[in-house]
From Swiss-Prot:
It comes from the Viruses. It is a peripheral membrane protein. GO terms for cellular component: host cell nucleus; membrane; virion membrane. Pfam families: Flu_M1 (PF00598), Flu_M1_C (PF08289). This is Matrix protein 1. Belongs to the influenza viruses Matrix protein M1 family. One of its GO terms (molecular function) is structural constituent of virion. Keywords: Host nucleus, Membrane, RNA-binding, Viral matrix protein, Virion. Residues 165-252 are annotated as: RNP-binding. It comes from Influenza A virus (strain A/Brevig Mission/1/1918 H1N1) (Influenza A virus (strain A/South Carolina/1/1918 H1N1)). Residues 1-164 are annotated as: Membrane-binding. The gene is M. Plays critical roles in virus replication, from virus entry and uncoating to assembly and budding of the virus particle. M1 binding to ribonucleocapsids (RNPs) in nucleus seems to inhibit viral transcription. Interaction of viral NEP with M1-RNP is thought to promote nuclear export of the complex, which is targeted to the virion assembly site at the apical plasma membrane in polarized epithelial cells. Interactions with NA and HA may bring M1, a non-raft-associated protein, into lipid rafts. Forms a continuous shell on the inner side of the lipid bilayer in virion, where it binds the RNP. Determines the virion's shape: spherical or filamentous. Clinical isolates of influenza are characterized by the presence of significant proportion of filamentous virions, whereas after multiple passage on eggs or cell culture, virions have only spherical morphology. Filamentous virions are thought to be important to infect neighboring cells, and spherical virions more suited to spread through aerosol between hosts organisms. The lineage of its organism: Viruses, Riboviria, Orthornavirae, Negarnaviricota, Polyploviricotina. Homodimer and homomultimer. Interacts with NEP. Binds ribonucleocapsid by both interacting with genomic RNA and NP protein. May interact with HA and NA. Cannot bind NP without genomic RNA. The keyword DNA repair does not apply.
């Protein structure tokens, strides 16, 4: 796996799923391929994106700044600086300085990532802030190792939280989760169907599913009534794709 592929993988792992994730993936690909060279416009676009947490925006801003060539005097962006200040906690800053000294001795991406993984996400973000604010310099490879370690820490805690929700025995939470998943699957079906004539059928299935979820929420239904809703939808989507000559088995 190439270095940039690895960086893209880690960074996208902390972005919530949805149309915005697809858009960010495209920007990252363009930046890494050298197709997008306007850092100013890129940062302005990032700053105004909804849904993303300030820290995720800060990490993306850091990655864009590392990758896109820019004039030396280009201003650092406040939204990135604020996100990478370790919540203003002096302990984070102390640890960040110690980590920075260790990173200065590293020359490889994997070496830097290994060293960084033993620190908390707050200290890692502060260390990125040091480098972003030009208070310290490391090679781009080492900076990317720091980015990936930070994303791994964040993704780990997101995964723990997600697992808690998925394995919860509370029927109301499970019911709502199934309806949310069915609704987002329906939305994805509508987007994939596009505007071709054969798409009417898939659109109809998706639309009915969304109406059904709406009705279930409006009148309040038994928690088990949503079981299988998303799987039924995905089966419909796969049947539609087969007719269109597209084979995609990996939805479940």
């Amino acid at each position: 796996m190439s270095l940039l592929t690895e960086v893209e993988t880690y960074v996208l792992s902390i972005v919530p799923s949805g149309p915005l994730k697809a858009e960010i993936a495209q920007r990252l690909e363009d930046v890494f391929a050298g197709k997008n060279t306007d850092l100013e416009a890129l940062m302005e676009w990032l700053k105004t994106r909804p849904i993303l947490s300030p820290l995720t925006k800060g990490i993306l801003g850091f990655v864009f700044t590392l990758t896109v060539p820019s004039e030396r005097g280009l201003q650092r962006r406040r939204f990135v600086q604020n996100a990478l200040n370790g919540n203003g906690d002096p302990n984070n800053m102390d640890r960040a300085v110690k980590l920075y000294r260790k990173l200065k001795r590293e020359i490889t991406f994997h070496g830097a990532k290994e060293v960084a993984l033993s620190y908390s996400a707050g200290a890692l973000a502060s260390c990125m802030g040091l480098i972003y604010n030009r208070m310290g310099t490391v090679t781009t490879e080492v900076a990317f190792g720091l980015v990936c370690a930070t994303c791994e820490q964040i993704a780990d805690s997101q995964h723990r939280s997600h697992r808690q929700m998925v394995t919860t025995t509370n029927p109301l939470i499970r019911h709502e989760n199934r309806m949310v998943l069915a609704s987002t699957t329906a939305k994805a079906m509508e987007q994939m169907a596009g505007s071709s004539e054969q798409a009417a059928e898939a659109m109809e299935v998706a639309s009915q599913a969304r109406q059904m979820v709406q009705a279930m929420r409006t009148i309040g239904t038994h928690p088990s009534s949503s079981a299988g809703l998303k799987d039924d939808l995905i089966e419909n989507l796969q049947a539609y794709q087969k007719r269109m000559g597209v084979q995609m088995q990996r939805f479940k």
